[in-house]
Amino acid sequence: MGTVNNAIRDSVLFTTADSIINWSRSSALWPETFGIACCAIEMISAGCARYDLDRFGVVFRPSPRQSDVMIIAGTVTRKFAPVVRRLYDQMPEPRWVIAMGTCAISGGVYNTYAVVQGSETFVPVDVHVPGCPPRPEALMHGFLLLQEKIKRSRALAGTPLDRVIAS
């Protein structure tokens, strides 16, 4: 029974449909305009004319219901983490998360009881963009890594993917 399902899943029809679906998903990433701290300034500058994320198909959206990418850019406190999780839950499937900056990845220099030590404790993070704050080029590289991850996924088979760390 398992070999028949694998043969159907790996057939030409499904792999072609997967590649078309993944191409369209990776070519139109709509991140939510959501910045918490100083990394948000670099995220804003990445959307301006000098770096122009629009050429990668990245268009910032004002609502979580219109977004498929969440960029956590900055320090998340324990009081604010449920709000971020609620915004994540309001996003339609499929959805991805980019943790931008040292504070979003590991809590940064704020090793206190009030700061969450990493965004992966309350949302699944797909791409990590390190830096304090990371340059707009690093965020662009993170989007390119996310696009490659989406292209490698199997949309119709439902295969889970590994997490990616931008270096």
Swiss-Prot record:
- A GO term from the CC aspect: plasma membrane
Ordered alphabetically, the record's keywords are: 4Fe-4S, Cell inner membrane, Cell membrane, Iron, Iron-sulfur, Membrane, Metal-binding, NAD, Quinone, Translocase, Transport, Ubiquinone
What is a single molecular function from GO for this protein?
NADH:ubiquinone reductase (non-electrogenic) activity
Where is it mostly found? membrane
Q: Which reaction does it catalyse?
A: a quinone + NADH + 5 H(+)(in) = a quinol + NAD(+) + 4 H(+)(out)
Q: State its location(s).
A: Cell inner membrane
Q: Name the EC number(s).
A: 7.1.1.-
**Pfam families annotated for this entry?**
Oxidored_q6
Q: How does it sit in the membrane?
A: Peripheral membrane protein
- InterPro entries with a match to the protein in the record: NADH_UbQ_OxRdtase-like_20kDa, NADH_UQ_OxRdtase_20Kd_su
Enzyme class, one word? translocase
The free-text cofactor remark is:
Binds 1 [4Fe-4S] cluster.
The reply to whether Transport figures as a keyword in the UniProt entry is: yes
GO biological process, alphabetically ordered? aerobic respiration; electron transport coupled proton transport
Query: Which coenzymes or cofactors are required?
Result: [4Fe-4S] cluster
Residues noted as binding [4Fe-4S] cluster in the record, renumbered to the chain: C38, C39, C103, C132
Family affiliation: Belongs to the complex I 20 kDa subunit family.
Q: What does this protein do?
A: NDH-1 shuttles electrons from NADH, via FMN and iron-sulfur (Fe-S) centers, to quinones in the respiratory chain. The immediate electron acceptor for the enzyme in this species is believed to be ubiquinone. Couples the redox reaction to proton translocation (for every two electrons transferred, four hydrogen ions are translocated across the cytoplasmic membrane), and thus conserves the redox energy in a proton gradient.
Quaternary assembly: NDH-1 is composed of 14 different subunits. Subunits NuoB, C, D, E, F, and G constitute the peripheral sector of the complex.
| Name of protein | NADH-quinone oxidoreductase subunit B 2
